[in-house]
Amino acid sequence: MAKIVVALGGNALGKSPQEQLELVKNTAKSLVGLITKGHEIVISHGNGPQVGSINLGLNYAAEHDQGPAFPFAECGAMSQAYIGYQLQESLQNELHSMGIDKQVVTLVTQVEVDEGDPAFNSPSKPIGLFYTKEEANRIQQEKGYQFVEDAGRGYRRVVPSPQPISIIELESIKTLVENDTLVIAAGGGGIPVIREQHDSFKGIDAVIDKDKTSALLGADIHCDQLIILTAIDYVYINYHTDQQQALKTTNIDTLKTYIEEKQFAKGSMLPKIESAISFIENNPNGSVLITSLNQLDAALEGKIGTLITK
């Protein structure tokens, strides 16, 4: 039996609540399949599109005097509840259909970051919708948002993405896992908080990369494997070129060389690779599997996906 952290990509969860719910129902079958094989899993998820949409909608309402503006940390908490609810419900239903008596809990999770992190001076995390270059330029002029081109898919708003330092609710996660609870935690990388005087915490406007927090969580609870589910089947080098090549198996030294060659897009595949390296360096006997959400079953059989080891 292995202990596994499964990190679901926010971009792989669809563009609407309805699409997300259908994708989550299918994902629940694969995740419960891991449980029936005797594995112990903890689930995390991204929230880039979802938190961006929540923030955009609330800002629109505030600009038209239809409600208050909400800080980004609160928007992150809303996205944890929204995505976590759909995951939790789908998992509960699938477990029940399989005759498995197991509780599922979504835990609103805070993650400590450093207020002095240089990421606050260099926004890099894409969130929200994809725009054309013309649309992005117009919104940038109107709202002052920063945009980047995101791996050939269009332009997206970027926000600071500081490094996770510690998971505030870690002991609660451990207790739930030890008591046979299926835990959904660290949604969207966790709500970023900074430590103030007397060890109090305060939310800060940012989005932590969910794969980096998932790697930290995996190390903290001594997992055997980190599974990163995204929108593509493999990790690729020379991505979107005539020389595009899928990596089926690789190791962290090779990946470090590819990072030096700038093979992975910043804010897209790069943080996944950095997270994989971090996880394995903290778990030398562990492995990382990166593949698409809809290919999880085939990837677990070794038929598809990128497997990373030391």
Swiss-Prot record:
One of its GO terms (biological process) is arginine deiminase pathway. Belongs to the carbamate kinase family. One of its GO terms (cellular component) is cytosol. The keyword Thylakoid does not apply. This is Carbamate kinase 1. The keyword Lipid biosynthesis does not apply. It comes from Staphylococcus epidermidis (strain ATCC 12228 / FDA PCI 1200). Gene3D superfamilies: Acetylglutamate kinase-like (3.40.1160.10). It is an enzyme of class 2 (transferase). Pathway: Metabolic intermediate metabolism; carbamoyl phosphate degradation; CO(2) and NH(3) from carbamoyl phosphate: step 1/1. PANTHER family: CARBAMATE KINASE (PTHR30409), CARBAMATE KINASE-RELATED (PTHR30409:SF1). Signal peptide: none annotated. It comes from the Bacteria. Keywords: Arginine metabolism, ATP-binding, Cytoplasm, Kinase, Nucleotide-binding, Transferase. Its EC number is 2.7.2.2. Its main location: cytoplasm. It is found in: Cytoplasm. NCBIfam families: arcC, PRK12352.1. CDD domains: AAK_CK (cd04235). The gene is arcC1. It catalyses: hydrogencarbonate + NH4(+) + ATP = carbamoyl phosphate + ADP + H2O + H(+). One of its GO terms (molecular function) is ATP binding. SUPFAM superfamilies: Carbamate kinase-like.
